[in-house]
Amino acid sequence: MTIDGKLYHVSKNGYAIDRYAKGLHEIDGGMYYVKEDGSFLTNSAVEYLTFDANGRYTSGNATLDSYVDQALAACTNSGMTKAQKLRAAYLYVRDHGAYLARPHQARGTTAWAEESALFMFEHKKGNCYCFAGQFLYMARRL
């Protein structure tokens, strides 16, 4: 629900606005960031996490988000605990890719994860950065 241009989460019964402390929260399978005033962060980022117009975490890349959602749908289910889902994501990454020598990232580089994850999803092979990037985005989505 939007009030005065700020997004708030309405409880499942539809009668009250849920209150959350400042910080990251998992709500209905999505990750959200709540600001000091109780509203949800939208169309912005906090440190390394980006949130869309609905306040939900996104990689910022629709293609990558689609790959991640498809992979998670293939290896997890709603009956799993968070730990089981994380293990399933790890096994998915381990079992759905092959090693391919690729150029190393420059020391101190922080922008490698997105490109590496996309490469891994698209080619089903990559170096350690590709495996790590793919797992990173899958884990964040959980």
Give residue ranges: language-model regions.
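Polybasic, low-complexity, intrinsically disordered segments
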Residues: 37, 54, 80, 84-87, ...
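Generic, ordered loop/turn and secondary-structure boundary motif
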Residues: 41, 121-122
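Secondary-structure boundary elements
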Residues: 63-120
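Cysteine-centered nucleophilic/redox motifs
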Residues: 89, 123-142
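Aromatic side chains
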Residues: 8-9, 32-33, 90-92, 99, ...
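Extracellular adhesion/carbohydrate-binding repeat motifs centered on closely spaced tryptophans
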Residues: 1-67
